């Protein structure tokens, strides 16, 4: 057992235990800081708070007769601005937005804005570069539910010389008006938001989740919206009851999401957990998701944004996460007009999600929409409806059910045709599945270029529930169906086993090369 520091500030640290486990251990371990018991935890990745700046600490983890130690020194901090001293009350009655915003704007480089215990009623906060924002234990940022008290971001603004546009607002892959998020970063860098507190969107079916198909004023806000940002870290705190997507980094890079807890009701609409859109160099580690839509959805805009900015999402690592109750555990799409590449998912637990891996695309995403080099390794799935889904006929768009999108015949490859290649699934065990082992479907005119499965074990629940494996026209509900694979040029299966299925283990059509051993 080894212990390493993966993130450190002047007041906090996140550590990772290297012991070959996924997300958590069977037993709790004891964490000692400089010889004193700090807490007990069974988590592989955990955080420490309440540390002092520029101070050396020895951390010892004891579990089942084993010990692991590490020593580190916390970083520098210039000054702390306590929002109470700036005028915030934290009584849940006063609108504290302006007071917290004043503290953020007044905070110098390498300073800390401290939000102590209390309930702070707010609308939208805006970050600035080179600061640290701490949500202390017991601190709650309680978002106002009156949408018309939030600022509005226009979708696209024409430049003064009429030669360029400035994109600010976004909704599901298009430049559209949106309400500002609860916490916003616009072109900021070197920011850490950390602590043991809570951001509560206070969304419910009486406000933000009511009549979600109608835009009223603007589209719904995200909990945290980061646009064109660099070097941003979110560490340790809790988020719940989001109006829509919880974390939405947009055209940003150098992002770290560590040891966060994200919860929304299972029936809450469009409450994705973390949706990096046209982002690169993203680390997602130690997060717990339990929500009403995709846990993680990697995107890059619809065809207009893909053609205009040609900014794929790339170099994304997801590890040691627990994903529960969502539609998809890790989803790519469906807004992927600029493509997605180099995604690695490892050492994760998927529990009670509709799908494990979920790739959603369709004709019309464009030739820049290349989804490539996506790998899953050392994954456990429990009670997942369908472990692997690749759907090239996704119908959830205004034109998603048109003949062009849903035609099963090979159409000409043109500037509207997306591509999928190099998908890898290794060391995966999925138990108590329900609908199908997989549903992997490329386009007949642009087949998926290589799928490899190695050391994959799938078994079905005895009382398997029926469901539709993929959101495309003509797919009927089923249960305990085997590996369905269509329109793939190369399929390689090494040590792949399936038990409890009805009928054939593999149902394949239009496969150019199949190798099994």
Feature locations, PLM:
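Extracellular/periplasmic carbohydrate-active domains that bind, remodel
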Residues: 1-517
């Amino acid at each position: 057992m080894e212990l390493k520091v993966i993130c450190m500030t002047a007041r906090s640290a996140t550590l990772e235990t290297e012991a070959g486990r996924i997300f958590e251990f069977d037993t709790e371990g004891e964490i000692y800081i400089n010889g004193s018991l700090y807490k007990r935890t069974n988590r592989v990745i955990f955080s420490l708070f309440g540390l002092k700046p520029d101070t050396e600490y020895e951390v010892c983890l004891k579990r089942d007769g084993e010990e692991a130690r590490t020593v580190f020194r916390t970083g520098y901090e210039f000054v702390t601005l306590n929002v109470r001293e700036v005028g915030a009350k934290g009584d849940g009655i006063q609108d504290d937005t302006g007071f917290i915003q004043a503290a953020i704007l007044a905070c110098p480089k390498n300073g800390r804005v401290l939000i102590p215990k209390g309930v702070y009623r707010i609308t939208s906060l805006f970050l600035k570069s080179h600061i640290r924002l701490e949500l202390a234990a017991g601190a709650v940022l309680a978002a106002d539910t009156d949408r018309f008290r939030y600022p509005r971001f226009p979708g696209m603004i024409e430049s003064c010389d009429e030669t360029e546009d400035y994109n600010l607002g976004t909704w599901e892959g298009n430049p559209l008006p949106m309400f500002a998020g609860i916490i916003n970063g616009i072109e900021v860098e070197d920011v850490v938001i950390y602590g043991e507190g809570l951001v509560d969107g206070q969304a419910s079916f009486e406000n933000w989740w009511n009549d979600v198909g109608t835009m009223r004023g603007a589209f719904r806000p995200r909990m945290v919206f980061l646009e064109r940002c660099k070097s941003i870290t979110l560490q340790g705190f809790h988020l719940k009851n989001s109006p829509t997507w919880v974390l939405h980094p947009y055209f940003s890079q150098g992002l770290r999401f560590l040891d966060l807890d994200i919860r929304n009701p299972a029936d809450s609409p469009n409450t994705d957990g973390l949706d990096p859109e046209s982002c690169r160099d993203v680390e997602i580690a130690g997060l717990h998701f339990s929500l009403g839509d995709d846990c993680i959805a990697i995107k890059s805009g619809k065809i207009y944004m893909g053609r205009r900015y040609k900014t794929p999402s790339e170099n994304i690592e997801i590890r040691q996460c627990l994903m529960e109750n969502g539609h998809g555990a890790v989803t790519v799409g469906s807004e992927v007009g600029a493509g997605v590449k180099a995604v690695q998912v490892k050492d994760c637990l998927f529990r009670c999600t509709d799908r494990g891996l979920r790739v959603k695309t369709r004709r019309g995403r464009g030739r820049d929409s290349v989804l490539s080099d996506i790998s899953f390794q050392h994954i456990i799935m429990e009670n997942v409806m369908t472990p692997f889904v690749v759907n090239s006929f996704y119908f959830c768009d205004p034109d998603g059910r048109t003949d062009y999108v849903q035609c099963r015949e090979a159409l000409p490859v043109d500037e509207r045709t997306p591509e999928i290649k190099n998908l890898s699934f290794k060391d995966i065990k999925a138990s108590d599945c329900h609908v199908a082992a997989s549903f992997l479907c490329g386009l007949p005119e642009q087949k998926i270029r290589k799928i490899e499965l190695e050391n994959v074990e799938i078994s079905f629940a005895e009382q398997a529930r029926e469901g539709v494996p993929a959101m495309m026209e003509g797919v009927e509900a089923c249960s305990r169906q085997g590996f369905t694979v269509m329109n793939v040029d190369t399929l390689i299966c090494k040590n792949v086993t399936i038990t409890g299925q009805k009928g054939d283990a593999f149902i394949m059509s239009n496969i150019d090369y199949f190798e099994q051993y």
